[in-house]
């Protein structure tokens, strides 16, 4: 079977296991009496999961000993979770007669047990032990990134032991299906993919870390838009073939009756909520017909009604954002109550009783939650997007309640006020509609107040008043100043209101992303699993390398050989008397970055490869390395090449005795690796034996048979017990065989001397 076919089969099995896990999670929340007829099928599925684990478990474990893949890892976790939780449901069903429905829910959902998402992680480094607690998804990702940064001061056994604890956490989370519990995810914590995306997008002069503060992560978990409609029950009811057709018909009839009552009540309420001023104006206009003369007053009322109607039903322009949102939280609460009424009605029609599901049995506890917790828990009747839109609607409503903003956002306000004043002038009471409409129609607008009569001028002599006005135009200065001030006040209010609305809209757009990520249904992404697999494969490759080189045909172990001291002294004296070629510093620096970088960020091995400094940049930035350490790391090789770069004593290369603390141990490991790189560079230029290849043990890979492929070169294993291994005369594809020569050493100079001896003419080594 080819690799593609094997992958297809694993994907098919993984999909079926995921479907089974989803069904188990649904059954945990259903009335246990509904599970009793399904016990046979549940047991058959549980036995199938056991059979799959027995049949695939051995092969999956054997593969994990050499190299893990995300698919195989996810399948292993899903099978383990499915077996444990499926049998938990079966045990709870067997005990339901004694424990009752509440005991069933407490057993299946582990309500009386401590939180299952708290996992302690212990890591032994060369600089001392590290203890951490993983309780969120971003905690697991942060620990994996920290372990990736500290890989060169961590042995493979300690690294794999720590990853085993992380795997337990991932089994309870990533292995539990596709839906993420809301208490596990905090989208305000950016992941490594968020950082990489911000590094390749336009920053507009803003620092990456400042942009990360405004980042909402959608990689560790991915949000899904879920829509819930009122007709979902009616839509799926005809497909419930397990009940009699008569009961289905009765349930459909009951749903139609409920919907008719709801629509009738909604229409009656809508008809009774019309503004009283508009009602009076409508009755006033309805009492007129074409055989009656239309006064200017009646025409003004009709004109105001026209403008009010045109702004309400007009199709000019796009609707405002405030008008596009759904009803407020009270409306959503009514929608949820109607959904539960529908569900209870259908259950009574189909089964003759209502079922004790989890949300009904624990309704009192759920009602005790506050608004925020209630929205996080969610509802089967209201989608998260409806909650989000209701929140934004409430935000807009509160902001728009200011009179200043109401005048700007609601242009009909002035029209309604004018209509109300007009009806009041003609003697119509807008509160109860009393008054004689016929007499009111004869009122002329010219006599409704405003300008005084022509003959009632206060000035006795018209000519004198006119002369004074013409000679002294400044007498209206106060009036003009008042009008100008009013106009400026109006313009300032409009500008201030528009700016306020723009700021509110910008705030809503920014916060909406976080609201959607928090309240929507989230599913597990692939970032966390890929990060775990990459870190696991790095430590696993180191273990496989150490096991592979131990099977070589010729093994020379100089780690505890006292006879190698003369070789150490000779090679050290020969290399230290020669200066380092400064033209080699760029390549030497890149080799340093390549050897200290962790296994997670392997950008140099991508199809579109990036230099080693890019991968190291992602590694140190994702762990929040302090700026002074980043500066020291960037200039490390340049500084080391200018001084005495030989720091290790005889057979004490990669020795950390007496050093405590992660930072101090890490800095010493950098010095050891820098010494190895500089010694190899000078060795190649002095003895003219070609380039000495410095390789990493965690960049070796197994073949299809599981054998580790190790090409010829000097390997750094990052193991304090055996830090340096030289592999000579390996097969063309890196296979370790009888002709392969392997040299173990814990001293750089004695190892180079041994390599020089093996490369001498007539030795047969290469």
Swiss-Prot record:
Residues bound to ATP: 683-690
Protein name (database record): Tripartite terminase subunit 1
Presence of the UniProt keyword Zinc in the record: yes
Job description of the protein: Component of the molecular motor that translocates viral genomic DNA in empty capsid during DNA packaging. Forms a tripartite terminase complex together with TRM2 and TRM3 in the host cytoplasm. Once the complex reaches the host nucleus, it interacts with the capsid portal vertex. This portal forms a ring in which genomic DNA is translocated into the capsid. TRM1 carries an endonuclease activity that plays an important role for the cleavage of concatemeric viral DNA into unit length genomes.
One Pfam family this sequence matches: PRTP
GO cellular component, as recorded: host cell nucleus
Subunit annotation: Associates with TRM2 and TRM3 to form the tripartite terminase complex. Interacts with portal protein.
Lineage of origin: Viruses, Duplodnaviria, Heunggongvirae, Peploviricota, Herviviricetes
Molecular function GO labels: ATP binding; zinc ion binding
Subcellular location: Host nucleus
Protein family (similarity comment): Belongs to the herpesviridae TRM1 protein family.
C3H1-type zinc finger locations on the chain: 191-219
Keywords: ATP-binding, Host nucleus, Late protein, Metal-binding, Nucleotide-binding, Viral genome packaging, Viral release from host cell, Zinc, Zinc-finger
Biological processes, Gene Ontology terms: viral DNA genome packaging
Metal-binding listed as a keyword: yes
